[in-house]
A protein has these predicted regions:
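Outer membrane beta-barrel transmembrane domains
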Residues: 279-280, 344-394, 398
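Bacterial N-terminal signal peptides
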Residues: 9-17
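Bacterial N-terminal signal peptides that target proteins for export
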Residues: 1-9
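Outer-membrane beta-barrel "beta-signal"
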Residues: 234-245, 382-384, 391, 410-423
């Protein structure tokens, strides 16, 4: 406001001092060049200042605000996934028709005071994201964490975020090449939790690199609050990049959307031990009956390969616990393992065809509760990228087959179509 007022006064002074006529003409002999330069400088400075303070808007990277003194930065992003689908039994009869906003999320990232003090906040508004926790707490918050980043190698965080256990879970649900993650990750994959996080990074894009990730968390999942069982979760993960890191953080994005010009590989392994967990799947699942708890261990091994539009991912993961079915109710801890393999090729950076095969194998003592000896799901997916993962259309077709199922009436075929839009 002060700057604008100065500009108006300067323009008025130009008219009065230099005797510019009503028709805009300057009387002969009057030299107004220097005065005009002064006025133009003020006007140009104001416009430049306004442009400098305007938010930066870029599709896929959100809306960013930062003052001219760089004392803070805030980036706002949102995304939504609208899904329709249908499931069919062995005789191709329709068993379910599905239409929903699968995800609707709002995210804030940035730093305060210094780029060394980073924060990340993410909220989820759909029923699957915001349904109450098993202990009845509000569950709107997905992420709320602050990091101290003393240099490019270290991150130290306190708050709620994804535990760094397996590749498939670390990938954002907005960066998938299928409508959703595999059945293997849905059962065995890690989840969000509250606690202390430490990360170490070494190397770069063109040379050997590694990442060492660890956390000590509450162990009961996101938004749990206080825990009275005395148990915590301890998680560690190591990632190796023999040929250097992926461009544009491609290790966290499915498919080779960057189109790596040289081969890139990631080899990863992780383990999470949840001491005295109150939930059937460690950081997620339903409550164990009564005051029951279990020590639950989850193990992970995965790899990624990308080269010129081709992408290959493989995941092996599982869970172990003592006496997983020793409860007075139907509750049980799913112990066993699973394998997921998927491959894709991106044509002209627009169309992607992907295939995936996922197998779940419960341990013998929990097979009666799981309802099968082996569950295998094969999926064919097609994605049309309009603006990368920020605006895309996805169609996938899944076929399910179970060995020794408890019921022969399980869904055999599922088709899903999803629109994803984000800023």
């Amino acid at each position: 406001m002060k700057k604008t007022l100065t500009t108006i006064i300067a323009a008025t002074a130009l008219v009065l001092t230099n005797g510019i006529g009503a028709n805009g003409a300057v009387p002969e002999g009057r030299d107004t060049s220097n005065f005009r330069k002064w006025v133009n400088t003020i006007v140009d400075d104001e416009i430049s200042e306004q442009l400098a303070n305007m938010p930066n808007i870029e599709v896929g990277k959100g809306i960013s605000f930062s003052p001219k003194d760089d004392s803070f930065k805030t980036t706002i992003r949102f995304r939504m996934q609208n899904l329709v689908g249908a499931s069919f039994d062995k005789g191709m009869g329709v068993t379910e028709v599905n239409g929903q906003v699968r995800r609707l999320r709002l995210r804030f990232d940035g730093f305060i005071f210094s780029p060394k003090f980073i924060y990340s906040i993410q909220l989820g508004f759909t029923g699957s994201d915001a349904k109450p926790t098993p202990n009845g707490k509000s569950n709107l918050i997905l992420d709320a964490i602050a990091y101290y980043k003393p240099n490019s190698s270290w991150n130290l965080g306190l708050g709620q975020a994804k535990i760094k256990a397996n590749r498939a879970m670390l990938n954002s649900s907005g960066s998938l090449q299928f409508v959703d993650r595999s059945i293997v990750n849905s059962e065995f994959g890690g989840d969000r939790d509250f606690g202390l996080f430490g990360e170490y990074y070494y190397g770069g894009i063109d040379k050997f690199a590694l990442a060492a990730l660890a956390s000590v968390t509450l162990g009961e999942g996101r938004n749990w609050g206080a825990s009275n069982n005395g148990g915590l979760a301890y998680t560690g993960r190591l990632e190796l990049f023999p040929l250097g890191r992926f461009h544009a953080k491609g290790e966290y994005v499915e498919g080779d959307t960057y189109h790596e010009e040289t081969p890139k590989i990631m080899l990863g392994a992780g383990y999470s031990f949840n001491h005295r967990s109150q939930l059937t799947r460690g950081m997620k699942g339903s409550m164990l009956p009564g005051d029951e708890t279990r020590n639950i261990g989850s193990y992970y091994a995965d790899m990624i390969f990308k080269y010129r539009g081709f992408s290959f991912n493989a995941d092996y993961m599982g869970r172990h616990a003592a006496d997983p079915a020793g409860f007075a109710s139907p509750s049980f801890v799913y112990t066993g393992s699973g394998v997921n393999v998927q491959a894709s090729y991106l044509f002209d950076r627009k169309w992607e065809v992907a295939i995936r095969n996922s197998s779940m194998i419960p341990n013998r003592e929990v097979r009666p509760f799981a309802g099968y000896k082996v569950w295998n799901q094969s999926t064919l997916g097609v994605t049309r990228y309009i603006i990368g993962h920020s605006l895309k259309l996805q169609l996938d077709l899944s076929f399910n087959q179970m060995a020794k199922p408890a019921s022969p009436d399980y869904d055999r075929l599922a088709v899903r179509f999803q629109l994803e839009l984000g800023l």
